[in-house]
């Protein structure tokens, strides 16, 4: 054990009395992970406040230093959809609360708003593509009150039509939509909240429906995971989770149906004796789909297979912890390959650095089946807590009582392949995550990440599976809206490769085959790193429109794609300047990941480093003399490849 007496300006190691208070770093975001150096301190109570400040300052400096040194964070290029890419549709009135639905194999997009569902058909012109479905409250007696509106919060495709559910003046109800006509289905508790809010989940799995929405308005402070339809209705205990914020849920169907699981992802408040350390913990919870509730009267309507585990999104090189769960994207493996299902988690650190960590369902399943229970020091009962029962048997009361009192497993879920740091780390605050895995010839060889920022833009990251780099590269920023605004919802159509994204004002269709934005030469096409693009017929082309022989993943190196003469065409200018004058030469920054430098007669005149320059690389020619005469060359260096961009022949007047 280490002993520490801390001040704000300089932490000093000194020996204190063993009677002083013990601080474990689990209060900072994970046991032994705050600084990655010391697990436990004995702290004098008077030093507690200054110690917290010291630790926070050290961690902020560590995070900033690591973020600057390890990778280039900013997007390589920036594209505005108003430049002719994509399509836009406007709502008319402002819609502060929306839900987005896209019908597969069609160009239809539904947006649920206040008393209205908007239908946009992006295959037709904007003048003929909008339909309004009015679904006003059935209890609308006080029009001046927002609580008497009908905010649509759920759109779900069913065999008999589109299910739409809304707040309905605090009397949650649902409607069925067919061919723009609506049928009122009546009150449906658990499918819509009493008022619009985030963090409400509804999961449909075969004949069962799961929900985190409160069934009673008076229990607005209650947070439970429920099964509300299908098999017997069940809910989690009051003590199972501490003020959880639910993010995502999924069903995993295994080879033995009795062992099917429901996994839900959330963050919760952690118990801490030190209020200076606001502490949230990212979690995954599990229940068995076959759970029939308990045997006793106290457990008959409770989940008896609920367990929870911590998701460990950590950079072990720097000790940075990402403890706030923002979003989850689930990549579903093919049928009968459930263990290969991937969980992509978007996290924030306490200082608003973002990270994406990858977990596997196989690892999650292993942790729940093998880990001890946290703070439980006795032999586990048989069957062990969390185990699914065959033939719809009830979990024995003894097993339920242990799991109900000790629902957290001791082992965390680590990143895929025990990775030492997240696949993405960024200074940007990201809010939502989508993932597309690129497949050619039956092999996944690249992963594309779509991340939304708090400013309303989309960042696209790429990681090649066989790359020596373990992190993804930020290749593109997209501004999707005509009117800049935060992004409320985003959907991926991975069949037609479209993104659908909406704000409170508009919805946009973003094509993912943006190959033409990268330039009109092979070098620029290759340097984009976009796995969806290749050089074909003297054009940067969408790979799915090119044959495998010419556009497949074999064309990965610069020489393979572009040949030996890959350099772009050099732009040449001739300028004349007065003697003893000051002039500026500007070299365009065609990539935010490149270094630029001006040379003349083989000597470097000016360097613009990738981590410091923000715009064009400017060369100042001060007090021009005869030595100024000649050709000034702007060069670009990116990934060990150097090419000429610009030649300016300067003569004196």
From Swiss-Prot:
Disulphide bonds annotated for this chain are: 587-634
GO BP terms, alphabetized: integrin-mediated signaling pathway; positive regulation of cell migration; regulation of inflammatory response; semaphorin-plexin signaling pathway
- Give an example GO cellular component term for this record: plasma membrane
Domain named PSI: which ranges?
514-563
Q: Which UniProt keywords apply?
A: Disulfide bond
Q: Which Gene3D superfamilies match?
A: Immunoglobulins (2.60.40.10), ligand-binding face of the semaphorins, domain 2 (3.30.1680.10), YVTN repeat-like/Quinoprotein amine dehydrogenase (2.130.10.10)
Cite a single GO MF annotation: semaphorin receptor binding
The residue ranges of the Sema domain are 76-512
Which InterPro entries is this protein grouped with? Ig-like_dom, Ig-like_fold, Semap_dom, Semap_dom_sf, Semaphorin, WD40/YVTN_repeat-like_dom_sf
Q: What does this protein do?
A: May act as an immune modulator in host-infected cells.
- The protein's name is Semaphorin-like protein A3
Q: Which organism is it from?
A: Alcelaphine herpesvirus 1 (strain C500) (AlHV-1)
Q: What is the lineage of its organism?
A: Viruses, Duplodnaviria, Heunggongvirae, Peploviricota, Herviviricetes
């Amino acid at each position: 054990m280490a002993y520490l007496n801390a001040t704000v300006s300089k932490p000093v190691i000194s020996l204190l009395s063993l009677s002083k208070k013990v601080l474990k770093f689990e209060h900072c975001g994970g046991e032994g992970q705050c600084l990655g150096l010391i697990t436990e301190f004995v702290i004098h109570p008077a030093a507690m406040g200054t110690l917290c400040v010291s630790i926070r300052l050290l961690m902020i400096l560590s995070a900033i230093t690591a973020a600057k040194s390890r990778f280039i964070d900013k997007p390589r290029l920036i594209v505005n959809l108003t430049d002719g890419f994509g399509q836009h549709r406007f709502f008319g009135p402002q819609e502060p609360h929306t839900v987005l639905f896209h019908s597969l194999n069609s160009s239809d997009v539904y947006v649920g708003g206040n008393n209205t569902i908007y239908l946009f058909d992006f295959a037709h012109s904007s003048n003929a593509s909008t339909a309004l479905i009015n679904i006003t409250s059935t209890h609308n007696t006080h029009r001046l009150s927002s609580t008497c509106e009908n905010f649509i919060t759920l759109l779900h495709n069913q065999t008999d039509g589109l299910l739409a559910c809304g707040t309905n003046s605090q009397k949650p109800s649902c409607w069925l939509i067919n061919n723009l006509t609506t049928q009122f289905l009546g009150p449906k508790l658990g499918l819509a909240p009493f008022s619009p809010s985030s963090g409400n989940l509804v999961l449909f799995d075969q004949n069962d429906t799961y929900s985190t929405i409160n069934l009673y308005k008076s229990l607005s402070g209650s947070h439970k995971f429920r099964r509300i339809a299908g098999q017997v209705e069940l809910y989690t205990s009051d003590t199972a989770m501490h003020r959880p914020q639910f993010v995502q849920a999924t069903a995993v169907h295994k080879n033995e149906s009795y062992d099917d699981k429901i996994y839900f992802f959330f963050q919760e408040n952690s118990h801490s004796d030190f209020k200076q350390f606001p502490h949230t913990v990212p979690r995954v919870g599990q229940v068995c789909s076959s759970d029939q509730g308990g045997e006793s009267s106290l457990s008959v309507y409770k989940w008896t297979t609920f367990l929870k585990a911590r998701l460990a999104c950590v950079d072990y090189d720097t000790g940075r912890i990402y403890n706030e769960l923002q979003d989850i994207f689930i990549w579903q493996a093919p049928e009968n390959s459930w263990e290969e299902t991937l969980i992509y988690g978007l996290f924030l650190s306490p200082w608003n650095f973002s990270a994406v960590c990858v977990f596997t369902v196989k690892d999650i399943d292993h942790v729940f089946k093998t880990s001890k229970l946290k703070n439980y020091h006795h032999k586990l009962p048989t069957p062990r807590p969390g185990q699914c029962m065959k033939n719809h048997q009830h979990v024995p009361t003894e097993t339920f009582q242990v799991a109900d009192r000790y629902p957290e497993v001791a082992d965390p879920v680590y990143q895929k392949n025990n990775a030492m740091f997240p696949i993405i780390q960024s200074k940007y605050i990201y809010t939502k995550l989508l993932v597309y895995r690129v497949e050619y010839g039956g092999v996944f060889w690249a992963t594309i990440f779509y991340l939304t920022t708090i400013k309303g833009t989309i960042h696209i990251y790429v990681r090649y599976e066989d790359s020596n780099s373990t992190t993804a590269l930020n290749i593109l920023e997209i501004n999707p809206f005509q009117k800049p605004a935060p992004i409320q919802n985003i959907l991926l159509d991975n069949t037609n490769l479209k993104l659908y994204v909406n704000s409170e004002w508009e919805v946009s269709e973003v094509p993912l085959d943006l190959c033409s934005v990268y330039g009109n030469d092979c070098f620029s096409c290759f340097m984009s790193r976009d796995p969806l693009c290749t050089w074909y017929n003297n054009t940067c082309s969408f790979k799915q429109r090119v044959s495998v022989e010419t556009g497949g993943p074999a064309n990965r190196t610069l020489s393979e794609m572009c040949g030996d003469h890959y350099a772009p065409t050099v732009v040449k200018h001739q300028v004349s300047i007065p003697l003893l004058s000051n002039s500026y030469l500007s070299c365009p920054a065609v990539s935010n990941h490149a270094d630029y430098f001006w040379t003349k007669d083989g000597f470097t005149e000016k360097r613009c480093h990738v981590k410091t320059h923000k715009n064009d690389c400017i060369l100042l020619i001060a007090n021009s003399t005869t030595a100024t005469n000649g050709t000034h060359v702007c060069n670009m260096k990116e990934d060990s490849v150097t090419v000429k961009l610009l030649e300016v022949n300067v003569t004196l007047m």
